[in-house]
């Protein structure tokens, strides 16, 4: 049974239906729906959304994720970037998050589609803040260079869990490769803010979480999200424990002392939850001063 702090208010049914109608009208997918995010009612009610590009079927089989898997998903839709840009304009979004399924079947892993989507958003809404949440592109520097050159305001790549749990939770991923990706972003464009996130409750230990946080600071990661893992179905990795809100708060305090510009740490936090608010907090004078002190 889930603890009381994970209970959510019923979403605004009218706002939910309106958002879903808009997404269907534009033929778009969201990670909010695909990953069964517990916050989608709140986000859709506020007119915020995380767009999912490159289809809604993944080539990997992470045991925490609800998105369906397939060795060779359908070819990407070339009209996707423009439709995302039009939907964003229709919603009046000031901060857009774009993520994707992992497409190991594509030569560039979908990097070109990320770049096209950023460019399409900028053409329609030049002032919009674009945040991208990318896969590891199997370690391809060229693919990473493609997305960095498109100059999103934030580049996010989630480590998801601690190294020890990768074989059972992310069997086709590699902790070192993901950490290196975040380092390479800074090598390519030092001023680009990077962001990463972890799910807690998969069986990790406190010292392992702190080690991952330290690893992220060693590659100059700026922003961190920590949230509770929730099992999508009985076939997925079990929840080993529910982490209390007080523990999440302790990690937030430690993270800020480590020098992260901003840390969102709470049971229902997800990597793009309240992304605009997180971005603004990260650019506040207080967070800039904190980051400067920890350099």
What are the residue ranges of the model-derived segments?
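Glycine-rich active-site/cofactor-binding loop and its immediate structural neighborhood
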Residues: 59-100
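Structural motif
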Residues: 52, 101, 131-135
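Auxiliary Fe-S-binding modules of radical SAM enzymes
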Residues: 1-50, 54, 66, 82-86, ...
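Distinct, well-ordered alpha-helical segments
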Residues: 109-112, 140-149
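Hydrophobic residues within beta-strands of alpha/beta enzymes
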Residues: 96-98, 130, 155-157, 224, ...
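Nucleotide phosphate-binding site architecture
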Residues: 38, 59, 163
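Conserved radical SAM core fold
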Residues: 71, 97-107, 137-140, 153-175, ...
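Metal-dependent catalytic neighborhoods of phosphoester/phosphodiester hydrolases
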Residues: 108-109, 275
